[in-house]
Amino acid sequence: ILNLLGQLSGIATNAAHWATIAPRQVAATRKTVWGLLDKWAVHLGGGLTHRLNKDDATMIKENDLAVTEQSGMQAIVALLSTMDVSECGAFLELEVTNEKDAIVAATTWKQRQESESLPQLVLMLDNFGPDRSKEMVTELTDMGLRDSVVIEASGNIIFDDLEAWRECGVDVLSTSAINRGTAPLDVSMLIDQ
């Protein structure tokens, strides 16, 4: 039990370190060793847990788009136009790997919001980096689309680069670095007689 406590305490401490320094909210990804225990430790440290399991929210990743009848932007439009939001859980998230897909997704979602009462779409910018993310946020703002989306940056986000993310304008940074490879705290137990 000491090993488990040490590991989870290390994750909570690391999450607190990230949450204190990060310019915005920081979330753990699905990549955990101890599952819900890792997620709870991240939560205790001040980070977001993202999804605890797949049923908590709907996340559409590039592999999901690849197996649809349409391809690329057509698949994004088709999915976002017809998705039953009441079945999505806490939120609906779409992973995009390029600027065109991000704009198509935000435009499609905004058009749907104009005729339906819908929450913001979570738009995950995968491997965009701080500079590209900042340009994307600016472009979405200039196009009047920014209010329709929550922007999450993910992919290769490390603690040493947090300062570079400060001015990019994303809402959430998600990374497995919060909980994976975290050094455990040195916990010991003494029994008095």
Residue spans of the language-model regions?
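Acidic/glycine-rich phosphate/pyrophosphate-binding loops and surrounding catalytic core
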Residues: I1-Q120, D131-E135, E139, V150-E152, ...
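Short secondary-structure boundary segments
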Residues: N127, G155, A177
